[in-house]
A protein has these predicted regions:
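Conserved SAM-binding loop of SAM-dependent methyltransferases across substrates and taxa
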Residues: 74-86
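A short, conserved alpha-helix within the catalytic core of class I
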Residues: 171-178
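N-terminal accessory regions of S-adenosyl-L-methionine
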Residues: 1-48, 133
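Conserved SAM-binding motif I beta-strand of class I
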Residues: 89-94
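Conserved alpha-helix/loop element of class I SAM-dependent methyltransferases that forms part
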Residues: 47-64
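S-adenosyl-L-methionine
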Residues: 107-155
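A short acidic, Gly/Pro-enriched loop at the edge of an enzyme's catalytic core
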Residues: 153-163
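Conserved class I S-adenosyl-L-methionine
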Residues: 64-73
């Protein structure tokens, strides 16, 4: 199946190869935080799918862009957005604990490697009883993390250039799909 993905992608540009190298290097660093045995994830499918996703995205929007990732999984789209253009504004939304936790780890690592802090997790603001940031007033390069139950209140209308919902359909209940 991986060979089929590669075949469908066609040849990789130097930019694609550079992106894949930086993506893998970043994921390796995050993996060292999570597993001390040297175990690493097989990123082949993530890389192939993400390259395919971004080839489509870039046909419709120029970067930097405002990107909403609903059901952000392991935050691969957020990492890709960051690696492709540091001024992209990225918002991850999720409602599952495991997904939210790994997204927080990835987005926090991105923030630690950035020249200035640009990451805001809305759960942190809720716990601290502080007012939520206004995403519509975000500075270039900002990254936001929003639990799904807050989305209706804090996600601005008509703000995003791209909405990504990769692999979300199978997680929705039958009621949500009708």
């Amino acid at each position: 199946q991986f060979e089929e993905l590669l075949h469908n992608l066609g040849s990789l540009s130097k930019e694609d190869e550079d992106w894949a190298r930086r993506y893998t290097m970043f994921c390796d660093r995050v993996a060292r935080l999570l597993a001390t045995t040297g175990l690493r994830a097989d990123l082949r499918y993530d890389i192939a799918e993400t390259l395919s996703d971004w080839r489509t995205i870039l046909k419709f929007v120029d970067l930097p862009a405002n990107i909403l990732d609903f059901g952000a999984g392991c935050a691969r789209q957020g990492l890709s957005a960051y690696l492709r253009h540091p001024d992209n504004i990225y918002t991850a939304i999720d409602g599952t604990l495991a997904g939210y936790t790994i997204q927080n780890t990835v987005l926090s690592c991105m923030d630690a490697l950035s020249p200035k802090s640009a990451f805001c997790d809305f759960l942190d603001y809720e716990v601290a009883t502080k007012p939520y940031p206004d995403i519509s007033q975000a500075e270039k390069g900002s990254r936001f993390h929003v639990p799904v139950w807050m989305a209706e209140v804090v996600i601005p209308e008509r703000f995003y250039d791209v909405v990504i919902a990769a692999h979300v359909h199978n997680e929705l209940s039958g009621y949500d799909c009708t």
